[in-house]
């Protein structure tokens, strides 16, 4: 899979505007300013494919990116939680749940994780901004996440840095596995 050939498809302002789903869609969810757009740029090896802003909530649209036979979907903040159940099925291939590694999960993070567990939607947690912590701080936060997140030991997770690319290859491998297998649960 050639990640350099990913293309921005379109932004949608409302869920009702989404076209019928004709291929596997993998979604990126997380609070505003957690680094979803930066992650997309890093895994696609592009600096400006997804617009990045220091202002929280700047991504207010649902942004679609095409990568060969799949779509990657950048969801606005926690907008995914407000979608009708019928629309959630379209992103049931996998949700990448992004959490800022520097902080404990927010109430919204926990609500989303619990929703994904209860709905049996496969997901991977991506801990962003890993480069902002020392090795010791990272170990402490991972121990904290193990206490704070239910079933943590059973959930696939990736420590990621948009600055140095740590974790990007692992995320690409997950995407490739899903693209090859179609819609299988990897976690």
Where are these regions (language model features)?
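Nucleotide-state-sensitive switch-loop elements of NTP-binding domains
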Residues: 78-89
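Conserved nucleotide-binding/hydrolysis micro-motifs of P-loop NTPases
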Residues: 58, 70, 77-80, 102-104, ...
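Conserved C-terminal guanine-recognition region of P-loop GTPase G domains, centered on the G4
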Residues: 88-155
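Short, glycine/charged-enriched secondary-structure capping and boundary segments
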Residues: 22-23, 41-43, 86-87, 110-114, ...
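Low-complexity, flexible helical/coil segments
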Residues: 40-46, 66, 96-97, 131-136, ...
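Short, flexible loop segments at the rims of nucleotide/cofactor-binding pockets, characterized by
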Residues: 49-51, 83-84, 100-104
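Conserved G1/Walker A P-loop phosphate-binding module
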Residues: 1-80, 180-181, 185-187
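Canonical P-loop GTPase G-domain recognition
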Residues: 3-16, 132-187
